[in-house]
Amino acid sequence: MKKIALLSLLFTAVSFAQIQKMEPPFWWSDMNLSNVQIMFYGKNIAQNEVTVSNGIVIKDIQKTENPNYVFVTIDTKNTPAQDFVFTFKNGKKLFTKKYSLKARRANSKFRKSYDSSDMIYLIMSDRFANGNPNNDSDASVTEKADRTNPNGRHGGDITGIINNLDYIQSLGATAVWPTPLCEDNDERGSYHTYGQSDVYKIDPRFGTNEEYLKLSAELHKRGMKNILDYVTNHWGWQHWMYKDLPTYDWVHQFPGYSQSNYRMTTQFDSNASAIDTKNCVDGWFVKSMPDLNQSNPLVLNYLTQNAIWWIEYADLDGFRVDTYSYNDKEGISKWTKAITDEYPNFNIVGEVWMHNQAQMAYWQKDSKVGAIESFNSHLPSVMDFTLYDALGSVFNEDKGEWDKGMIKIYDNFTNDFLYPNINNMLVFAENHDTNRFNQMYKNDFKKYQ
């Protein structure tokens, strides 16, 4: 009996040694996205033949130039919630890995999202409230807490947000948008977490995946909504996958470092040169943020499944998507459509930081401006940066001048006809990338009013 137990433990240890990552870690039955592409990562794992139990159908197996990856697509349509087993065999050697299809929450597909009736409270996650000082520095990540460093980690976390939800609600907020919470293992400046190193894992300095579930539950208990800040354009250079790329073109590569020219207008400018468009879309946002290649089907599928996984897992109510207009526009359109096909009422707002209404309208779903180039982003909402531009100066200007003062606000509204859905715009006076509104007006309370 002891010998059998020992062999069982040894077999399990071998299995874990062979598979270092399995993503998504589980899925759900009764999903619109029923052909699930599971990525297995481990030393020379592609040398194995892959089979699966329970009559589950393998639709496709993709191996890349990197033998440490294999992508296995299974058909889960009409498959009830259950556990099944993948078997990996190489000659006489074999090991197994359990996979789970879970039952969905009731009415998950038609979940209610945020809309123009909501007041959203934006939180810089590391800088809001420290609810658990014990997780300020974690052995698994490089940068430790240092409140003396303005660019360092200061200790804000998920527990701190939960502890202050009653306060946030008392301000009139009906939704919370924390800046990204997934792991960012950059050695410095990681507090913003826009350079993520593991997109299936909450940064341990913020808490755990389970604590993020609790945040959603506590928000919903109060009738409030949880908006996840998602990044499709780039990861951080410490992402575990960047250190061992599945394919050379998983990220955009250049002979040397090439930074984005930030000219988002090249995405639709009929006069733009091909090199300018390429530099905008394929160039890296900054040197520490490898630019993801959404025109690679494996990358696009990985990002799509990851986004849907977080919605279903954490019971989310919406997305804000960072640097939306820097992505490959056809790829990001497919990504957005896949999510809204899965969740028809799910709102997604894109950061389209442009200063012209026609250019911004191009990126909203069913835009007549986009239709000129036969493009539909499928993006329900965009952030109203032109209104933000006007709000930042109008109260400092002479109202008697023809094009100054409140006339700027009026002129902004006269262009509302360009948007296919003006009632689904995210209106704001400031955010984490801008000066505070009081800074713009030198703490003049009358102007603030």
Describe each region flagged by the PLM.
Residues 18-46, 103:
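Beta-strand/beta-sandwich contexts
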Residues 63-113:
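Extended acidic/polar, glycine-enriched regions
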Residues 111, 119, 165, 240-289, ...:
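Core domains of carbohydrate- and sulfate-ester-processing enzymes
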Residues 216, 220, 234, 306-308, ...:
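Active-site-proximal helices and loops of the catalytic beta/alpha 8
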Residues 144-159, 195-209, 285-300, 317-326, ...:
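The substrate-binding groove and active-site-proximal loops of carbohydrate-active enzymes
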Residues 137-140, 186-202, 232-276, 358-374:
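Aromatic- and acidic-residue-enriched segments that line the glycan-binding/catalytic groove
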Residues 4-13:
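Sec-dependent N-terminal signal peptides
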Residues 91-224:
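N-terminal structural segment of carbohydrate-active enzymes
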